[in-house]
Amino acid sequence: MSTVAPPSAQNVQGATSREFRHDINGLRAWAIVPVVLFHFGVPGFSGGFAGVDVFFVISGFLMTQMICRALWNGDFSLMGFYLARAVRIVPALVVVCAVLVAAGWFALLPPDYKMLGAHTAYSLTFLSDIAFWREAGYFDTSSHEKWLLHTWSLAVEWQFYLLLPLVLMGLARVTRSAHAWGRALAALAAVSLAACVWTTASNPSAAFFLIHTRAWEMLAGGLVFLAARTATYSPGRRRLIEGTGLVLIAAAILAFDAESAWPGWRAVVPVAGAALVLLASRESVWTGNRFAQWIGLRSYSLYLWHWPVYVFLAYIGLRFNGLALAAGVVASVVLGALSYTFVENPSRRALRKPRLDARIATLVGAAACVALCAAGVWRSNGVAGRFAPGVELAAAAATDVNPERARCHQSAGSTSPACLFGGTERKLFVVGDSHVAAIISSVVDAGPRGAAGVVQLSYDGCVFIPGMLQIRPHRFGANADCKGFTDWAAKQLDAAPTLPVLLAGRYARYAFGPFELDRDVAKPEVYFAGQPETTTTPAFLREFGRHLTETACKLARTRTVYMMRPIPEMPASVPQYVARRMAWGLDPSLSVTTAQYMQRNGWVWQAQNEARDRCGIVILDPTATLCHDGVCSATRSGRPLYSDYGHLDEFGAHLLVPVFARMYQPAAPGHSGGTTFSAR
């Protein structure tokens, strides 16, 4: 059984050298450049997010090296290790957070400022990964609106820093065998990888953000360090190992994209690539060139600043503007360089001299000061009153939603609370996706007071069409969730075969993808049989429409079926767009033409018309209320009608009460359905 000796006594090949590792510094450039270019939408870097995985491997390697050396020498200090990590990470992070909180006072609307305050506090306490995981969901603010979203990876690394020395110290008390240490870390890595693969399929948000599904990537770096202690390779073999690693990293960047379930098994590709480059321990033109070395030194500050720059461009509506994005990349590099020169380096020098307790007090005090200010911003709801009342009223539309949504609208599992509104007797089912949750209170208000008897069956990203499967399970949950909910909802309807049903949903989203400003997406998010379509074709729309018609007609055999025309989608989040434009003194009007609306929804109308003509279903048309003279406006008298891109807020939904009231009116003599109702 081999024993662990000090590094000087080992046959070490660079991996444990106390000298600066230029290959590691260059590998940092291979990590940060793809991340930045991916976020700024540069073609060819669709999998640039894999750079974060490369960073994780590097961190695991360096931390294992640092701790093992100190344990071998008998001078390891747990508090000293934690302090060294804090000196490396905290100062630049505090500056970024402080700048954002200060600038936000002047520029951010109360809802946005409140969110920034919460995220700042979480970031400075290294809990942002948990916060973003808990926030993740269909109604979550878009990622490009979260100024500190990128700090999730810092939180994961810090949590790893807290745990790794405890694990290694525990192993050192049990055995001095380096092989035993390696086997223990390998076992932990295997468990973490298994959890990662399983959780990516079952709970993708947790797999992406949390430490237990990411630890294996950092442990992989630690295993490389332990393996490299006694490894010897010829120059040719080292060149081959490094080349293979760089190819794997490049392959991950080129082959994967935002649609890829991540991390899962796919993350093995960049992790293995980074591990091989570290194992090779070779200075080459790929990692040793001046550009890679310059970027590598500034990679941490560049990572900290690039995302706020991108969010700023998104905030002012320029995230699809090529010239603005190019300027954003340049600005990120400049800010990263300034941070490295004036924050990172000076803080390291300044915090190297004082006593341990003084350094701890300085770091904790600075972080606590900014975190407490940020928490105050959150507690005060974004400090309302900084803008004109009309601006803040428009911004508040984002939270003008049904207060029962969280309780009655489902986003996981395969059932629903089946909330009953307006009385104790079931009289009407309302079934569909999140657009049901947006209109449900108005459906209830349209009925007899206290006797509407409305049952809500709604699920995130899942319109009621049996047999429909989701192409992107990592976004909305596994296919089985939507299918399971649809099967369950069908049983609920079958148990009451004569009760009327209202079907509603954002069908265009599933057929074409999102509808956003300056971007035209035509990629289905669902399929029905066989292989999913990669683009939205006329044949796919016909198939989708056929399933929609057949679903309605099957229900109409024993009951009255109502189908609501789709709500017009807007090309931007309405409360944010309107409030920001008002605050900046610009025209806040936002709308789509009926031609644009029909371009995405005409096929839905055709399917609904066919169901009306064939099966006597009744169509409820909100566009007669929401659209006038060929234009569907996002506001009414300057007030937003939507809480986001496509969901009506309570104010907007209330305008449709006359439309829904038709469901509660007795049919005319001799009438058997097949009608379209609207109201102006």
Give residue spans per PLM region.
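Extracellular/periplasmic envelope-modification machinery, especially enzymes
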Residues: 2-6, 258, 318-324, 328, ...
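Membrane-interface helix/loop caps of multi-pass membrane proteins
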Residues: 2-355, 679
